[in-house]
């Protein structure tokens, strides 16, 4: 299935400024993410950034990327990666049914299999009822369940998201043994696939109170009654780089996996 990967690459980060230029085994993180994207069947990769520095670094690597990769400067006042992608979609005038993969610039451990999984959801017979496709993986460590930097998701029996939160969801009462319940919690992996016509609807919605409280833009989708399908994949050790500590862990895992 034809799909285009767009990587929103904002330079500023309140918890880790300039993280997209942080070193991952000898290369800036944004370059590592692009390299991962190139292992997929995508027809095009667009880096959407508000940073001249990021743009120059990506352009410097053009010779090794081939003609699949482009980088575009965007406005700096976008409140989310989805808003930044919307600017690019309008600029390129993609067709309404074009599938877009929103790949975060701080996901250097992402795999082609994970990306293909969220795209393949749109081949399902029930895909007409799905607005957005994303991923999750079981959590097996208590410190991750209570970590507000790790977003949790609860799904129904059909794999549809009920809620996303930085808090521990579902809550476990004192009548349960945590060690016996490990694996019921799901860690959200922040990559998304959707069609351009969904993005047009999304941009017409205002921020919901839940989105403001949790600082999670995907809650705007649930608030407006649309469906997010969550593919649950086991044995994924994917880490978003949000802090210097997570950068250290990613460097260790990247060295092992490569």
UniProtKB/Swiss-Prot annotation:
Pfam families: CTP_transf_3 (PF02348). Its EC number is 2.7.7.38. Belongs to the KdsB family. It catalyses: 3-deoxy-alpha-D-manno-oct-2-ulosonate + CTP = CMP-3-deoxy-beta-D-manno-octulosonate + diphosphate. Pathway: Nucleotide-sugar biosynthesis; CMP-3-deoxy-D-manno-octulosonate biosynthesis; CMP-3-deoxy-D-manno-octulosonate from 3-deoxy-D-manno-octulosonate and CTP: step 1/1; Bacterial outer membrane biogenesis; lipopolysaccharide biosynthesis. It comes from the Bacteria. GO terms for cellular component: cytosol. One of its GO terms (biological process) is lipopolysaccharide biosynthetic process. Activates KDO (a required 8-carbon sugar) for incorporation into bacterial lipopolysaccharide in Gram-negative bacteria. Gene3D superfamilies: Spore Coat Polysaccharide Biosynthesis Protein SpsA, Chain A (3.90.550.10). InterPro entries: Cytidylyl_trans (IPR003329), KdsB (IPR004528), Nucleotide-diphossugar_trans (IPR029044). It is found in: Cytoplasm. NCBIfam families: kdsB, PRK05450.1-5. One of its GO terms (molecular function) is 3-deoxy-manno-octulosonate cytidylyltransferase activity. This is 3-deoxy-manno-octulosonate cytidylyltransferase. Its main location: cytoplasm. Keywords: Cytoplasm, Lipopolysaccharide biosynthesis, Nucleotidyltransferase, Transferase.
């Amino acid at each position: 299935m034809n799909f285009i990967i767009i990587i929103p690459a904002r330079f500023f980060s309140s918890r880790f400024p300039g993280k997209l230029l942080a070193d991952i085994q000898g290369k800036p993180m944004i370059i590592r993410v692009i390299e991962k994207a190139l292992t997929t069947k995508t027809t095009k990769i667009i880096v959407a950034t508000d940073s001249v520095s990021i743009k120059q670094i990506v352009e410097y690597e053009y010779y090794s990327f081939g003609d699949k990769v482009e980088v575009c400067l965007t406005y700096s006042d976008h409140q989310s990666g989805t808003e930044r992608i919307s600017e690019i979609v309008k600029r390129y005038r993609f067709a309404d049914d074009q599938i877009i993969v929103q790949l975060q610039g701080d996901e250097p451990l992402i795999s082609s299999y994970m990306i293909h999984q969220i795209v393949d959801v749109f081949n399902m017979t029930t895909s007409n009822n799905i607005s957005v496709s994303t991923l999750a993986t079981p959590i097996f460590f208590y410190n991750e369940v209570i970590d507000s930097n790790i977003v949790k998701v609860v799904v129904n029996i059909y794999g549809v998201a009920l809620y996303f939160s930085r808090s521990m969801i579902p809550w476990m009462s004192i009548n349960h043994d945590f060690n016996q319940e490990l694996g019921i919690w799901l860690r959200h992996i922040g990559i998304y696939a959707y069609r351009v016509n969904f993005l047009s609807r999304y941009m017409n919605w205002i921020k919901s109170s839940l989105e403001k409280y949790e600082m999670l833009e995907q809650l705007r989708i649930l608030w407006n009654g649309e469906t997010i399908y969550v593919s649950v994949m086991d044995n994924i050790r994917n880490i978003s780089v949000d802090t210097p500590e997570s950068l250290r862990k990613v460097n260790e895992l990247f060295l092992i996996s490569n």
